[in-house]
């Protein structure tokens, strides 16, 4: 709400209670503006890469205010990029089931903006992803732009109404993770994040490359050697297609036998 002071990047927060963030001990931050409205954040961390932020606004005044959920990731400059066809490094999102990949130079030329009901957004490196997961099933607008810095952000299109002597609460999740399949798929499943597995660059033949990866990974864990794992998955593929190849050869042989009869 433009009529009140809200926290900024320069706000000095007070820490309530525990001062060290660990997987077993969240930290709580608090700040009260001159109008008497208190903003609270509780930041917790799991045993891997997930930051959960519970945001609360407490209104002890007689006024009524509207607040919009908001989150932003900033990259100060373009990193060293590997120019590889199937590897995307830049701004990324899935919005209502559609994968969005924007290169840094594209965003410098033109801003990207779209509204959606579900999805996630972030900035992708070769081995790492930093991502925001907005509150789901609530319409939000995602924007990728460049103003001296690369910015990936979202803002809710509908406000949360805060009445007199009342409070509101909203949750935001941030994942700063290595692009490991077990980690990414684990968060996609446990947090019900739509198409979060597309964080990993599977290429255009996603429906083939991902099952092949799981097959090779299975045999690697079983045999302890990637060379043997590749041989094993190759044998499995040949066994799957053997009946089809055998049928094709039988048909060809039958055709050769029929040719003299036709003469």
Language-model regions: role of each:
Residues 1-194:
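Soluble non-transmembrane domains of integral membrane proteins
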Residues 4-8, 175-229:
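Interfacial loop/helix-cap signal at membrane boundaries in integral membrane proteins
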Residues 135, 220, 224, 241-244:
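Hydrophobic alpha-helix feature that most strongly marks membrane-spanning transmembrane helices
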Residues 243, 247-251:
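Pre-Walker A segment
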Residues 252-263:
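Single conserved hydrophobic/aromatic residue that forms the stacking wall/gate
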């Amino acid at each position: 709400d433009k009529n009140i002071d809200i926290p900024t990047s320069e706000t000095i927060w007070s820490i309530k209670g525990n001062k060290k963030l660990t997987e077993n001990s969240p930290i709580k931050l608090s700040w009260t503006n001159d109008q008497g409205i208190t903003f609270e954040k509780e930041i917790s961390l799991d045993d891997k890469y997930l930051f959960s932020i519970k945001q609360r606004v407490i209104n002890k005044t007689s006024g009524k205010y509207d607040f919009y959920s908001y989150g932003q990731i900033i990259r100060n400059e373009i990193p060293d990029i590997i120019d590889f066809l199937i590897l995307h490094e830049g701004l990324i999102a899935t919005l209502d089931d559609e994968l969005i990949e924007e290169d840094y130079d594209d965003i410098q030329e033109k801003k990207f903006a779209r509204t959606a009901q579900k999805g996630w957004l972030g900035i992708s490196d070769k081995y790492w992803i930093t991502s925001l997961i907005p509150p789901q099933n609530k319409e939000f607008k995602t924007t990728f732009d460049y103003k001296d810095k690369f910015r990936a952000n979202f803002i809710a299109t509908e406000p949360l109404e805060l009445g007199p002597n009342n409070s509101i609460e909203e949750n935001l999740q941030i994942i700063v993770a290595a692009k490991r399949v077990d980690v990414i798929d684990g968060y996609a499943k446990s947090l019900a994040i739509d198409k979060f597995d597309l964080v990993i660059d599977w290429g255009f033949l996603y429906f083939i490359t991902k099952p092949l990866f799981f097959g090779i990974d299975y045999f690697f864990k079983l045999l302890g050697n990637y060379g043997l794992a590749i041989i094993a998955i190759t044998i499995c593929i040949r066994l799957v297609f053997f009946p089809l190849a055998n049928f094709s050869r039988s048909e060809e042989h039958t055709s050769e036998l029929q040719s003299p009869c036709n003469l």
